[in-house]
Each structure stands twice: as structure tokens, then as C-alpha cells.
UniProtKB/Swiss-Prot annotation:
Gene3D superfamilies: HUPs, Isoleucyl-tRNA Synthetase, Domain 1, Methionyl-tRNA synthetase, Zn-domain, Nucleic acid-binding proteins. This is Methionine--tRNA ligase. It is an enzyme of class 6 (ligase). Binds 1 zinc ion per subunit. The gene is metG. It holds the Pfam family Anticodon_3. Is required not only for elongation of protein synthesis but also for the initiation of all mRNA translation through initiator tRNA(fMet) aminoacylation. CDD domains: MetRS_core, tRNA_bind_EcMetRS_like. One of its GO terms (molecular function) is metal ion binding. It is found in: Cytoplasm. It comes from Leptospira biflexa serovar Patoc (strain Patoc 1 / ATCC 23582 / Paris).
Length: 681
């Protein structure tokens, strides 16, 4: 029996362009939704632009536009960029809608009626020049702890200290530069603590959150839930609060309600809407980043509980996107906009690469462009695409492009691939995409070995029917492999369906074979990544930043003196702090493969399974102490977040820990049973 699922991804804020960090979540969600549809479930995918708040109001003023016209332009740009990466929404809406306004007002009034809203006067910064109360991020000054200048009103970007805007020294309004004054104002608060027990019970029911997210929520429960300020003083771009004068809903109140507005706008039918949001006849699944867990794991479900709606069925929480182990940087050219990436590189390659890196946990997703090139060219193009192209062009032409029937050997190989279906389905459901990609490429290796063993390009010269048999087996296997891959690379899979002369590749027709059939013309499925395009993309990103921010470009920390960097991280006595030690991510790894490296006396090439972190390739200088054979199956300790290093023989993505010298090296191994990916503490 098919399921009914409503899926959302977090709403992009309407004050900037879509970048690769946004694409991570959009693609992660899209893969999951496509999979659900491919197995026959009814699944809707809703999103919207998050359009309210002071930053929108100020940005529009600087641009000489109304907030309404600006957010309309940005929403069109966002939709274009997101869909260019193959993200297929059922509705991409806006929070500045009539539906959202009505839902926000009715939810608030219900909460107020039920005693969950309280009014209280608070003191906050006010700019007499701009005649407005200032949000924390519109106040700047000197950090009260480290003395760093030009820091925001809520935290210091230099030392990391959090504080109140009142604690800033030499504070000023970031809009006009004048010194703000303190004024008292009435604010409205949502009594989140009223729902502590309900929220705990909700969290513990079923499989709502991954382990990391559940632990984080438990920390907040332990420290006690606090009231939440849901109002802002005018002028403010947002929805006016009913029964109040010059008060507006804080953007984080109406933003998640945008999921409901987008749903109703698409479904039209209130009966269908209520099946999801009131009656619980369908599942509601949110995909979010770990930085907004507090809002989606506490405020949002509590608001729904207090106003007669169903809380989400599941929160899928992911980590941040990093590049080479570091935050994305505009000055280094790694803070890449989606439109810039799509201009120079194939977006389906990035979808595939993200799938290779994405597990089901909250760990940050680190990408390396060296690894991107290697994975795509080797696993996607060399392994999977090449499997199809090598038997679908001239060889198939020489047999009038007609397939034969599967031999006994062919049926056996097809059955082996089909036996992985349940495992692959389970991995997709749990969002463990990296496992799916490993399984697919592993099966692809087996099929390619079959093709190489028979060499149909030679066989066609002497035995056409045997060659037809080999090609028939190869392409039936390719149909299965690309069906498994269909949620990730829909464009490639669509081209393959055209080749097979069938409407689509779906899990619903997975077991159907293609025999005694004339195939369509072969169209190139995908090309290899050219490294020069990556260089051009990064250069353009850096140059764009430098032109628009000449002063910041001069202060690029990546160009600072190396001695200064060293002295900032290691103290004179040689000690490091616990914070510095915590940056090193040590995990248990299971060695899956080990091979000698041709032309290297000391190196072994090792593939290490790190669980949800995926498979890491490592070039380890341990050949004098270990044979390749004795390493396979061994559990070791791995530095998992080491910056990938391009070596002569390939990309090394991690480091094995060992002690000793030369021929007496001894690998660190867990003392007791441990699972791949376990974090050392």
C-alpha cells in the first residue's frame, strides 16, 4: 500500500543568491522525494522563499526598490537556480502570501486564546536617526572580551564570545553609523516551556530524528526551555500582529508556516490539506540544516501542538557544506554560487558527488574538487556510463541494434544485482546515500568485469550471437544499476530510458527485462569533468568578490604570513588547547581493500570504510610493515577530517594512525569491538 508524504526543505532567505550550501539540502531532499515517487508513493515536495525581516527591508531600501518587488525578483532567481540542479518542486512559493498571513494570524490567536502568549516590556537598542529598533545584527561595536572592532551585536567573530548588544563598546548603528540609545518596548512571548513534556514525548516517538539531533534536543530539555520573543517593532517588513499596534511577527514565526501556505496553495483542496496537517493521514517530513534545529525541533512543533495541527512526522537534519575541510570562502573562490557552477560544470555530476558524500547523520559534508573530479570521472563516467557506451554504439550497430535473450549466466548476474534492491531501498529511506553509491559502483565493477572477460568488441568478429548475448546481459544489468541511480541522476537516466525505448526507469519495473528488442540510437549520457573548468569557476568567483569587496580582499587571511598563522595555533611551550585537539576527527575505520601502488616502494593504497562518512581512499606508507592481504578486514584508527592531498599516485583523503619506525610500524586498532565510523572520544 502506497504512502502519502509531504516533504519540505528549508526556505532560502530572499536577500542573496543560491550557493552550493543551499544546493546540498535541495538535492538531498530531491533525491529522497524522487526515490519515494519511483517506488510508487504519493509524495509532494514543497518549499518557498523566506521573505520577511529587517535585512530584506534595508536591502530593498538600498537598492531603491520596494521590499515586495525585490523579493519577487529574488524568488524567480532562486527558483531558476535550484531547478537548474534538477530539483523538482511541486510548488515553490513565498512566505509573503495571503495564505501565510491567514495561517500566521490564526495560529497566533489560538495560542493567545489558550494562554501560551505573554506580554512583557524589554529594553533594546533604538536608532534615533533611522527611527527604528535595531536587531542585534544591525548593531556593531568593539567586542567586550577581546577588543576586536566592528563586531556584531550578538557575538564576536574573532573570539567567538556571545553577549548582549548592551555589552558592546563604542556601539553604532550599522545602517547610519550613529550611536543607538536604549528604549523600553512591549514585546510578545510564546511560552515554549508550556510544551516541554509534549515535545519530549514527540521526540521519543518513532524514528523522528537521527541520533545527533535527538541528543542536541535533549541538551535543551535538560537546561529548560525558555520563552521565545515572537514580536518586532515597526518599521518592519512582515505581517502585522492582530490586536496590537505597530507590532509585527518575528520572521521565524511565519517562516515555517510557509510550509503550510505552500501546501495549501498547491493542493487547493482544504480536505486534502487537512489530511496531512490536522488528521495525520499522511507523513510530514522536513529536511533542515543543523543550524536551525532549535526552531524546527522546538518552536515549530510546539506552535503546531498549541493550535490544533499535527507536529512533523520526521526531521532529517544534515551538517554544513565545507570545502577542503574549511568553511566556504569568497576570497578563496570556494563560496560558489549555483549559477556560476552550472555555467562551467555538469550539475548532475554534483548531484552524484553529493550523494557519494551524504550519510544519514549531522556530520558536515566536506567536498574537495580534486576528489570531485576523481569520483565523477572514475565511478560515474568510467564505471557506469562507460558500461553503457562501450556496448551501445558500434557493437550494437553491427547486430542491427537488436538484443537477444538472457543466457543462464546472464540471468544469474541479473539476479545478483536484483538481490541488492531491499538493501538499496533501505539506504535511500534512511538517507544513507553514500552507501547506495558504494553499492551501485561495486555492482558496476562486477558487470564491467563480465564485459571485459568476454570482450564483445572482439567477439563480434567471430560470433555475432554470442556477442549479442553478452550485450543483452550488459544492458539489462545497466538498466538495474541506473534504476538504482535514478533518484540521483534523473537526466542521465531519462536518456537511458530513450535508448531502451521505455517510458522510464522505475523501481516498479525494475525486474522487467529487455530482450528481443531493437534499441533506439545511443546519445552520449555524460562527459568527463575537465579540471580547467573548475579552475575557471574558482577564478571567476574570487575575481567577483575582489571587485565588489576591494577592502576585504586586501585583508584575505589566506594571504597572511605563515609564521603568524603558526604562532596563532601553537603556544610557545608547544602545548595545544582542548579546543584545538577537538578539531582532529579520529574515527574507527574498516579496511575494505588494500593494494600495492605501482612505482611506490613504501605505499599501499587502502580503501577504508568510515560508516556514514563513506569510503575514504588512503595512500599509507606502511608497505614495509604490512602486506596488502593482511590489512583487509582490519579495524584501524583514522584521521577522518584531514584535508585531502593530491599525490603523484592519486588523491589521499585520510590518514591511518601508527607508531614505530620503518619496518616495525604498528597500526592503532580498537581494543574492543567498534563499528566503522565510531568517533574516538
Amino acid at each position: 500500500m502506497s504512502k502519502h508524504i509531504l516533504v519540505t526543505s528549508a526556505l532560502p532567505y530572499a536577500n542573496g543568491s543560491i550557493h552550493l550550501g543551499h544546493i546540498l539540502e535541495a538535492v538531498q531532499t530531491d533525491i529522497w522525494v524522487r526515490f519515494q515517487k519511483l517506488i510508487g508513493n504519493e509524495c509532494y515536495f514543497f518549499c518557498a522563499d523566506d521573505t520577511h525581516g529587517t535585512p530584506i527591508m534595508i536591502a530593498a531600501k538600498k537598492a531603491g526598490k520596494t521590499p515586495e518587488s525585490m523579493i519577487e525578483e529574488v524568488q524567480k532567481e532562486h527558483y531558476k537556480d535550484l531547478t537548474s540542479f534538477g530539483v523538482e518542486y511541486d510548488n515553490y512559493y513565498t512566505t509573503n502570501s495571503e495564505e501565510n498571513k491567514k495561517f500566521s494570524e490564526s495560529i497566533y490567536l489560538t495560542l493567545k486564546k489558550n494562554g501560551h502568549i505573554v506580554a512583557r516590556n524589554i529594553e533594546q537598542s533604538y536608532c534615533e536617526h533611522d527611527k527604528m529598533f535595531l536587531p542585534d545584527r544591525f548593531i556593531k561595536g568593539t567586542c567586550p572580551k577581546c577588543g576586536a572592532k566592528d563586531q556584531y551585536g550578538d557575538s564576536c567573530e574573532v573570539c567567538g564570545t556571545s553577549y548582549s548588544p548592551k555589552d558592546l563598546k563604542d556601539s553604532y548603528c550599522s545602517i547610519c553609523g550613529t550611536t543607538p540609545v536604549l528604549r523600553e518596548s512591549k514585546h510578545l512571548f510564546f511560552k515554549l516551556q508550556d510544551f516541554q513534556n509534549q515535545l519530549k514525548n514527540w521526540m521519543e516517538e518513532g524514528n523522528r530524528l537521527n541520533e545527533g539531533a535527538q541528543k542536541k534536543l535533549q541538551e535543551w530539555f535538560t537546561s529548560g526551555l525558555q520563552e521565545w520573543d515572537i514580536s518586532r517593532d515597526g518599521p518592519y517588513f512582515g505581517f502585522a500582529i492582530p490586536e496590537e499596534e505597530n507590532k509585527y511577527f518575528y520572521v521565524w514565526l511565519d517562516a515555517p508556516i510557509g510550509y503550510m501556505a505552500s501546501s495549501l496553495n498547491h493542493l487547493k483542496d482544504e480536505r486534502k490539506f487537512n489530511e496531512f496537517w490536522k488528521e495525520g493521514k499522511g507523513e510530514i517530513v522536513h529536511f533542515i540544516g543543523k543550524d536551525i534545529l532549535y526552531f524546527h525541533g522546538l518552536f515549530w512543533p510546539a506552535m503546531l501542538m498549541g493550535s490544533g495541527y499535527k507536529a512533523p512526522s520526521q526531521l532529517n537534519v544534515h551538517g554544513f557544506l565545507t570545502v577542503n575541510g574549511e568553511k566556504m570562502s569568497k576570497s578563496r573562490g570556494t563560496f560558489i554560487n549555483a549559477s556560476t557552477f552550472a555555467k562551467y560544470l555538469d550539475v548532475e555530476h554534483f548531484r552524484f558527488y553529493l550523494a557519494c558524500r551524504l550519510g544519514s547523520g549531522m556530520e558536515d559534508v566536506d567536498i574537495s574538487f580534486d576528489d570531485f573530479v576523481s569520483r565523477v570521472n572514475s565511478d560515474l563516467i568510467g564505471n557506469l556510463v562507460n558500461l553503457v557506451s562501450r556496448v551501445s554504439t558500434s557493437i550494437l550497430d553491427k547486430m542491427d541494434r537488436k538484443l537477444g535473450i538472457l543466457s543462464t549466466e546472464g540471468k544469474s548476474l541479473v539476479s545478483e544485482l536484483l538481490s541488492k534492491e531491499t538493501e538499496i531501498r533501505e539506504a535511500y529511506v534512511s538517507r544513507n546515500y553514500s552507501k547506495v553509491m558504494r553499492d551501485i559502483t561495486g555492482l558496476g565493477d562486477k558487470v564491467n568485469k563480465y564485459v571485459n572477460d568476454y570482450a564483445p568488441w572482439n567477439l563480434i568478429k567471430t560470433d555475432v550471437e554470442k556477442a549479442r548475448e553478452v550485450v543483452t546481459t550488459s544492458l539489462n544489468c545497466a538498466k538495474i544499476l541506473f534504476t538504482y541511480l535514478a533518484p540521483v541522476t534523473p537526466k542521465i537516466v531519462h536518456s537511458l530510458a530513450d535508448l531502451f525505448q521505455i517510458p522510464n526507469l522505475s523501481f516498479l519495473n525494475l525486474t522487467e527485462t529487455i530482450e528481443n528488442k531493437v534499441l533506439g540510437p545511443y546519445q552520449m549520457l555524460s562527459k568527463r569533468v575537465e579540471e580547467k573548468n573548475i579552475t575557471i569557476m574558482i577564478t571567476e568567483t574570487k575575481e567577483t568578490f575582489e571587485k565588489s569587496n576591494p577592502e576585504k580582499a586586501k585583508q584575505d587571511p589566506s594571504k597572511s604570513n605563515t609564521n603568524e598563522v603558526k604562532s596563532a595555533t601553537v603556544s610557545e611551550d608547544g602545548f595545544i588547547t582542548i579546543d584545538e585537539l577537538s578539531k582532529v576527527e579520529l574515527r574507527v575505520g574498516l579496511i575494505k581493500e588494500a593494494n600495492p601502488v605501482e612505482g611506490a616502494d613504501k605505499l599501499l593504497f587502502v580503501k577504508v570504510d568510515l560508516g556514514e562518512k563513506g569510503i575514504k581512499n588512503v595512500f599509507a606508507g606502511i608497505k614495509a610493515s604490512y602486506t596488502a592481504e593482511e590489512l583487509v578486514g582490519k579495524k584501524v584508527v583514522v584521521v577522518a577530517n584531514l584535508k585531502p592531498r593530491q599525490m603523484k599516485f592519486g588523491l589521499s583523503e585520510a590518514m591511518l594512525l601508527a607508531s614505530g619506525k620503518d619496518k616495525t610500524l604498528s597500526l592503532f586498532v580498537p581494543d574492543r569491538d567498534a563499528s566503522p565510523g565510531d568517533l574516538l572520544k
